[in-house]
């Protein structure tokens, strides 16, 4: 019963930022801009994904002092990233009071096989996923929120779209098998393809969606990008490099928040998309060497 209560508490926090925008920030000034723009939360990190991609090297957890400065400066929730499998980085982030931990493929993985046992923590976790199997495995480990991996730092939404479609298609298969009474197929799918307990599969079949909130992330750079992902069924969006690598961060941040809340109103999205200044320079995915693709980290 204690485990259930803890899971409900973690998932409850994740639902608090539903329909909102989480913005990457690297300093107090950016965090205040994000808060004033209406961000539901900020992700505190020393380098946005675009800079990590360009500068290379080993990307690690941010300096706790920088994260605490941002926590002191804003009233909205503050998230921070830990490396995949690096449970000590997660312990540190929990100890300084971050509101949610992102076990992130944007940072250099500490463990290429094992993810963090998120059930051992009080703080809720968000994790990336490219398909239903990855999403459910992270939920089985204790994740309270899922996000598409996309391809961070590119300003190109194509991978986020691909990952969201893959999750939706997987859910449709589960629901279809369940409604047709094909329990043997569901058991086989759980065991051989998704590699998760049947209990989670049945929860998906009943809810007809993931049992936790599912945000879009990776390559979102414009209000239309945010609305696109929301119309595909996302519960909110993460925006990394797309705001503070653009020509007018303050206006673009507000526009993306407006588009996320009003994702089904094209006239309003068109209005807030006017005169935003230059968007961040995007990268075509096929121009990225295979070994530099971040979304492949952590399956």
Curated annotation (Swiss-Prot):
Name the top EC class.
lyase
Keywords in alphabetical order, please.
Answer: Lyase, Pyridoxal phosphate, Schiff base
Instruction: Tell me which Pfam families the record gives.
Output: SOR_SNZ (PF01680)
According to UniProt, the reaction catalysed is:
aldehydo-D-ribose 5-phosphate + D-glyceraldehyde 3-phosphate + L-glutamine = pyridoxal 5'-phosphate + L-glutamate + phosphate + 3 H2O + H(+)
EC numbers: 4.3.3.6
Pathway assignment reads: Cofactor biosynthesis; pyridoxal 5'-phosphate biosynthesis
Question: Is Isomerase one of the keywords UniProt gives this record?
Answer: no
A single Gene Ontology MF term assigned here is: pyridoxal 5'-phosphate synthase (glutamine hydrolysing) activity
Q: Binding of D-ribose 5-phosphate: at which residues? A: 24, 153, 219, 240-241
Entry keyword annotation includes Lyase: yes
Q: Which domain of life is it from?
A: Archaea
* Active site: residue positions: 81 (schiff-base intermediate with d-ribose 5-phosphate)
Some GO term, biological process aspect, for this entry: which one? amino acid metabolic process
Gene3D superfamilies given for it?
Answer: Aldolase class I
Q: Which NCBIfam families match?
A: PRK04180.1, pyridoxal 5'-phosphate synthase lyase subunit PdxS
- Give the quaternary structure: In the presence of PdxT, forms a dodecamer of heterodimers.
Q: What does this protein do?
A: Catalyzes the formation of pyridoxal 5'-phosphate from ribose 5-phosphate (RBP), glyceraldehyde 3-phosphate (G3P) and ammonia. The ammonia is provided by the PdxT subunit. Can also use ribulose 5-phosphate and dihydroxyacetone phosphate as substrates, resulting from enzyme-catalyzed isomerization of RBP and G3P, respectively.
The record's family statement is:
Belongs to the PdxS/SNZ family.
Per its UniProt record, what HAMAP family does this chain match? Answer: PdxS
Please report the name of this protein according to its UniProt entry. Pyridoxal 5'-phosphate synthase subunit PdxS
Per the UniProt record, the source organism is Methanococcus vannielii (strain ATCC 35089 / DSM 1224 / JCM 13029 / OCM 148 / SB)
Lineage at the top is: Archaea, Methanobacteriati, Methanobacteriota, Methanomada group, Methanococci
């Amino acid at each position: 019963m204690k485990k259930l209560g803890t899971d409900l508490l973690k998932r409850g926090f994740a639902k608090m930022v539903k329909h909102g925008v989480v913005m990457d920030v690297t300093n107090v000034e950016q965090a205040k801009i994000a808060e004033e723009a209406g961000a539901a939360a900020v992700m505190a990190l020393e380098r946005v994904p675009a800079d990590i991609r360009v500068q290379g090297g080993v990307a690690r957890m941010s300096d706790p002092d920088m994260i605490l400065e941002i926590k002191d400066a804003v009233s909205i929730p503050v998230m921070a990233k830990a490396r995949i499998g690096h449970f000590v980085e997660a312990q540190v982030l929990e100890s300084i009071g971050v509101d949610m931990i992102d076990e992130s493929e944007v940072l250099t993985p500490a463990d290429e096989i094992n993810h963090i046992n998120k059930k051992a923590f009080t703080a809720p976790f968000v994790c990336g996923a490219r398909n239903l199997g990855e999403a459910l495995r992270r939920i089985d480990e204790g994740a309270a929120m899922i996000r598409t991996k996309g391809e961070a730092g590119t300003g190109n939404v194509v991978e986020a779209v691909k990952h969201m479609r893959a999750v939706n298609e997987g859910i449709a298969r589960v629901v279809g098998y369940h409604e047709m009474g094909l329990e043997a197929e569901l058991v086989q799918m759980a065991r051989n393809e998704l590699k998760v307990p049947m209990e989670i599969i049945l929860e998906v079949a009943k809810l007809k969606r993931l049992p936790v909130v599912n945000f879009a992330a990776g390559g979102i750079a414009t209000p239309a990008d945010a609305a696109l992902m929301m119309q595909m069924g996302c519960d909110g969006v993460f925006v990394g490099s797309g705001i503070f690598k653009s020509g007018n961060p303050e206006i673009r941040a507000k526009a993306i928040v407006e588009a996320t809340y009003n994702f089904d109103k094209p006239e309003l999205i068109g209005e807030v998309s006017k005169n935003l200044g230059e968007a961040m320079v995007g990268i075509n995915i096929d121009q990225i060497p295979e070994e530099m693709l971040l979304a492949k980290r952590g399956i």
